[in-house]
Amino acid sequence: FQSEVFSLKWLDLLLACATMKQVHEYFTYWDWIVVAGYMIFTTVLGHRLSGKQSNIKDFFLGGKTLPWWSVSGSMIATEISALTFIGVPGMVYAMAGDWTYLQWGFGSIIARFAVAYWLIPLYYEKEIYSPYDFMGDRLGEGARRLVTGLFSLGSILGQSVRVLVTAIILQVVTGMDARLCIVIIGAVAILWTFMGGMQTVIWTDVIQFCLFIFGGVLAMVLLVNELSWSQIVELNQVTVDGQDKDKLRWLDFTTPFQEPSLRYTMWVALIAMPFQNFTAFGVDQLNTQRMFCCGSIKDARKAMCWSSVSIMVTVLMLAVGAGLFAWYRVNAPSDLIAASFEKGNNVFPTWITMEVAPGLSGLILAGAFAAAISSLDSILAALSQTSLSVFYGRDKLEAEGRGREMVRLSRIVVCVWGVILTAAGLGLWAVYENNQDSDLIGLAFGMVAYTYGPLLGVLAAAILPIKVDTRGLIMGTVLSVLLVSWFRPELPLVLGALGLTGWAEELTLHRPELSSEWFFPLNASITLCCGWLVGMLGLNRKP
């Protein structure tokens, strides 16, 4: 699957809008009661479990008293989000779709164990709040500001996709305007983070994880009850472009030399994705902040390793996608519904709303909504912590007698970042609205391609015994971002939105084909080499 630039014809757009109205009528008042009840229950329970918030350690690290299994469940809930819930089934449902996305799980597991047994002991040498504190201690304040800026940029880009995904769910089942959905999502995420910091975030994540699994299992049971698994397997054998295709195929050994733009291959999974996942779980504060909530290296290591079971959730949602494809081959949708299914991202929420019993459909969709919020409240806590660390430093944050003042300030910063993230979601919707065939999974991973490589490069510079210069790291970061911008489709879209259609068309015409995943190791190497080369000139030395 590639994230390409497509435009819906006006007729398709009108048909899609008509479909939204038809679908949301199936969402009954019982569903609304279930959704409202679940959200109220989760909010109240999260508040009750938040504990005391007397200082910054309580707010951002949960007092370092959280059990490892809750931290692991929170990591899985954050990783999954609504992106997996509707993006993965939609990806399989597409006529050319299959299970090859599952191969990426190998790279994910390799990276988690590498983080658990190599990186966590380094982080626990000192009392720190983020990997950026670790890098700042070793490379200086300039490096800390660089990686914090990269993290903030990558978070806004990546999480805005998750805001968009959740808005799609709400739009399909409620008929509300997508922009209003985005504002509601942002407001709930701010509220949950504001209430109790990481304690609330982690415990609500555990609840979301349980409901998310329940929703996926229930959907699969209902599909298999209607169609046997053998029938689902048979119906997933199709002909695409005159060739037979098994939509349950999950292995692909095509090399990047044969098809450089192909992303779901074993070579990408084993070579490129370990770098992406090592950065995601070892450098991205969205996930690493959970490790710091554990009371010991042993607990943090267990939390990280056991989070590998998330691959089973991916298998579950791939199976749901195959089931949905078979379902609609047997139960052909109306022309209006079929028109909206050209955007595979609408398939699962539409099926839930129309085919699942009232009340149960509300519960499943509440789980999808809450799973999305669990990712967003996590990133708000992470952005707040890293921002305060840069502007105040750990000494001021931990100063005796200023604990409650810092907690109040943290909550204000959470609100500010919440508004920024909501605005980014609105901006992304403006782009997606005219390109609704985009592969959301590819879009999410493509967004982090801008920053993950440089982040990993700076971490390597902090760990390796070499001379580096922060200015070189900045140069490498700029080169990396420019390189990704050349290969990715977002820049032409932005230029087109600004009215620079000539430039956009020219850039699209001359854009090379290469899967975004290869930029994780490539840009890490570029950033590290630039820092090392400038450091070798003797302009600066690593402390």
What does each model-identified segment do?
Residues C17-P543:
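Membrane-embedded helix-loop-helix hairpins and adjacent transmembrane boundary segments
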